[in-house]
Amino acid sequence: MAAPAGGLGDAELREAQRDYLDFLDDEEDQGVYHGKVRDMISDNQYRLLVNINDLRRRNEKRANRLLSNAFEELIAFQRALKDFVASVDATYAKQYEDFYIGLEGSFGSKHVSPRTLTACFLSCIVCVEGIVTKCSLIRPKVVRSVHYCPATKKTIERRYTDLTSLDAFPSSTVYPTKDEENNPLETEYGLSVYKDHQTISIQEMPEKAPAGQLPRSVDVILDDDLVDKVKPGDRIQVVGTYRCLPGKKGGYTSGTFRTILIACHIKQMSKDARPLYSANDVAKIKRFSKSRSKDIFNQLARSLAPSIHGHEFIKKALLCMLLGGVEKVLENGSRIRGDINILLIGDPSVAKSQLLRYVLGTAPRAVGTTGRGSSGVGLTAAVTTDQETGERRLEAGAMVLADRGVVCIDEFDKMSDIDRTAIHEVMEQGRVTIAKAGIHARLNSRCSVLAAANPVYGRYDQYKTPMENIGLQDSLLSRFDLLFIMLDQMDSEQDREISDHVLRMHRYRNPNEQDGDAMPLGSAVEILATDDPDFAQEEEQELQVYEKHDDLLHGPNRRKEKIVSMEFMRKYIHVAKMIKPVLTQESADYIAEEYSSLRSQNQMNSDIARTSPVTARTLETLIRLSTAHAKARMSKTVDLQDAEAALELVQFAYFKKVLEKEKKRKKQVEDDSETEKEEEEEETQPEKEGRKQRRKKARTEGEEESYDPYDFSDAEQEMPEVQAHTPKTPESSATGEAKKPELADPRLKAFKAALLEVFKSSHAQSVGLKNVMESINRDNPEPFSLAGVKVALAHMQDDNQIMVSDDIIFLI
């Protein structure tokens, strides 16, 4: 065969055309491509998809030549297709200038990534996998121009080819304006033929790029029906011809060439890198969900990141994030997101980054980045200038590339405020809107955000409120569904457990690891075909539900706890995400009632502060977490137990105790040191159980009426419960012993009722003490003394119901 530069001779070209025509005309055989051509005609298409494996079986020599000498062979193949279409439907063949061939199947050594695409593949058919990072605008390119000369009444036709077409030699780019006799020509635009033309850039997959090296990219030329098939962020396989373009500078061709890929077929890879599972796997998943229906959520949460000790609530939240809620697009076009965003804030060395790394390895699609290494446009999208044409083009950022996945941002507090503001729209609306340099575009970025940050002071200061420690604006915090504060606490028993756990991790060794060999980070097996040939074999492999117990890996004390294997976890999450649970009326009423309780200031104690503001987004958070919990149970409805589990997570994440600084005293009781130790242990326990019992008791006592700012009876009922669950510091208990004489409960209730009438009758927020004394003692058979009134006012001031200043009573 002649070299590619010389091209095929006419005889060889005709022979190749005959071979391809015989391959297509298989009506006497199985009739596969005869039927495909008829389907192409009925669908009004002009590109036929051919499996290279079929051609290899019928004519191996021709298949090898097609892969190694693509330009001439593809021209012969397309001519054969046009002849075959003309024999089937002559009228349809005249409608289109050309018919095109698309290839799929197994390409073997020619199945490459942008990094392994080298000069040896020039003029060959290759299959390249990558992720789309840039897309140019669609431009019309002239294929044939028709010109009319009014003087001679003649018509001139000219065809144009360049290096992006299959022809060996490009035609002249001069557009005719005069004929040979210098008569002016008029262009007949209606008779001229144009084709669509677009350039995209694909980059190698982030998970397949070698660590520490920049990802490589390659430009792809799309023509005709292939344009606008992909957008930034899509993962695709491109089959096409690899070609080099000479670079001209000042009329001279330089020695370096620019390489491009001329596409003939594009296949969208699955948006969710879905695991392969068989009917047997689905049966195991259903059996597992039914057998462990009571504690299946806790079982899965314990199996998340088993190498990390503790953090039970955070693991439950991460499981909810991986499962996700249900996204809703309303009729008016507005979208209610189903993605769950989580922020981890805490001291150094509490496994924040390790949890992020685990999610990166578990989620089907995850992109990891850091605060210092990310800019606002790098996370969302950027408008860049094409060096070749000078036109503007859109470049996708990390959040667009992670559409339908998870974005893990470490060192979130190190980002600048301007860059953090750029992700506001992404976190709530799930899209990126760009309006720059004449480009107005909207890209999907429906992803969950998992961020880890350190407090403002490096370590968490428990004597300051959470808001002072976090140092992020409320507009950003309200977009996070859950905010967890992770503390490095001084507890000898817990430290002993952690040290034992970490030492066991260092002593553990994978049984498959050989001496002196490091295990690979990713899978060493790559599929060198557009379709997975080993799909059936992988289906037959037995799916292990539980990991085999190992004393070093799981600990000798956890023999009874079964850990779900990573592969089963991936498949279970993928199946559970497909379920769309519906809220029941009971759970909806419960969520609405608990949301109003969270908003109420009466739930706040003096030493408890909120980690993030409770807004209307908190209501959506409760719904999303309830839905995720229902998905874990494989339930089609969101029941009351799901709503209660979601509320438990929210209570743990939203409330944080603030310590009071101790004042030095000259005399200290011996028991003080013991009580302080007990209080420090109590501070480590979350306050959720106390609040949950208080709300349940309050609901049974009939606190569902509308809120009255002048009514003090509710607070009085709650006060003994609040005191029962609020540990007091030694100073507060000591000062409490030296208080003024107590007022009897009936007298205190009578005073509150009288004061209520005074405020209602005066229609004011503040009343003088003198006026109060006159009003409450008027027509009162048992008048209040001034000392008794002051004791009652002190009680109410302690309950944050009023404030007394300069004998003026202010209503709070």
From Swiss-Prot:
First-listed, main subcellular location of the protein, grouped into a coarse class: nucleus
Transmembrane domains' residue ranges: none
Catalytic class of the enzyme: hydrolase
One Gene Ontology CC term in the entry: CMG complex
Gene3D superfamilies: 2.20.28.10, mini-chromosome maintenance (MCM) complex, chain A, domain 1, Nucleic acid-binding proteins, P-loop containing nucleotide triphosphate hydrolases
EC number(s) given by UniProt: 3.6.4.12
Motif Arginine finger per UniProt: ranges: 478-481
Localization: Nucleus; Chromosome
Pfam family, one: MCM_OB
Alphabetized InterPro entries for the sequence: AAA+_ATPase, MCM, Mcm3, MCM_CS, MCM_dom, MCM_lid, MCM_N, MCM_OB
Reactions catalysed: ATP + H2O = ADP + phosphate + H(+)
Residues annotated for ADP binding in this entry: 354, 394-396, 398
Keywords: ATP-binding, Cell cycle, Chromosome, DNA replication, DNA-binding, Helicase, Hydrolase, Nucleotide-binding, Nucleus
Record field: compositional bias (Acidic residues): 671-684, 702-719
Record domain MCM: where: 296-503
Highest taxon of source: Eukaryota
Region ranges (Disordered): 663-741
GO MF annotations, alphabetized: ATP binding; ATP hydrolysis activity; chromatin binding; helicase activity; single-stranded DNA binding
UniProt binding sites for ATP: 524, 665
One of the GO BP terms on file: DNA strand elongation involved in DNA replication
Complex and partners: Component of the MCM2-7 complex. The complex forms a toroidal hexameric ring with the proposed subunit order MCM2-MCM6-MCM4-MCM7-MCM3-MCM5. Component of the CMG helicase complex, a hexameric ring of related MCM2-7 subunits stabilized by CDC45 and the tetrameric GINS complex.
General function of this protein: Acts as a component of the MCM2-7 complex (MCM complex) which is the replicative helicase essential for 'once per cell cycle' DNA replication initiation and elongation in eukaryotic cells. Core component of CDC45-MCM-GINS (CMG) helicase, the molecular machine that unwinds template DNA during replication, and around which the replisome is built.
Family in the record: Belongs to the MCM family.
Protein name: DNA replication licensing factor MCM3
The organism of origin for this protein: Gallus gallus (Chicken)
Gene: MCM3
